[in-house]
Amino acid sequence: MSFFISLEGIEGSGKTTQIKRLADRLESLGHAVLITREPGGCPIADQIRQILLHPDNGHLDPKAELLLYAAARAQHVAEVIRPALDQGKIVLCDRYCDATLAYQGYARGLDLPMVKQLNELAAGNCRPHLTLLLDMPHDRGLLRARSRNALGAGPEEGRFEQESLAFHNKVRQGYLDLARQEPQRIKVVDANGTLDEVCHRIWLTTSNALNLPGGM
């Protein structure tokens, strides 16, 4: 079954944890699943990821940041995502084009039509069939992300955690605006609650989109 699902959300919304659970559930039903992420997902894009997320690069110009994301995505799509879909796999991607719109467009203030154009250039017709937007208050998510990095889970990828609460609120509101624009594709999932509760909500939405048995 060739199907493309992206998971989006603010920092600390639990995407990385939940994407693994979703993959396990789908694989238990016999589906071939590929988990990947952005920025990154292949060697060239992973090198760009180091530039984009390292906290020492706080001075990175917003336009340079945007172009680096586009470059990483173009390689990622060509090398990983499109081949996996061609092989009939379900692709689960931790962030994709909507993240660029939310972060570089809504939060950084770059021209949204320009960002959309670059997304289209980088991704072509490789668009998610379903996007799961894990939503929670931006201050709670940021606190969770900063705590995670303080414990050493990602000390060299904390550049966005250094941004202000106002920045992260713009990211969240940007995501929600995108969901209002594309309600058929982007499904808002309440990311508050226990891991199992959020996992259940994600499965209900995913199983409905894939016409799979619901429930956990």
UniProtKB/Swiss-Prot annotation:
It comes from Syntrophotalea carbinolica (strain DSM 2380 / NBRC 103641 / GraBd1). Keywords: ATP-binding, Kinase, Nucleotide biosynthesis, Nucleotide-binding, Transferase. It comes from the Bacteria. HAMAP family: Thymidylate_kinase. Its EC number is 2.7.4.9. It is an enzyme of class 2 (transferase). ATP binds at residues 9-16. It catalyses: dTMP + ATP = dTDP + ADP. Phosphorylation of dTMP to form dTDP in both de novo and salvage pathways of dTTP synthesis. One of its GO terms (cellular component) is cytosol. It holds the Pfam family Thymidylate_kin. The lineage of its organism: Bacteria, Pseudomonadati, Thermodesulfobacteriota, Desulfuromonadia, Desulfuromonadales. One of its GO terms (biological process) is dTTP biosynthetic process. Belongs to the thymidylate kinase family. Gene3D superfamilies: P-loop containing nucleotide triphosphate hydrolases. This is Thymidylate kinase. GO terms for molecular function: ATP binding; dTMP kinase activity.
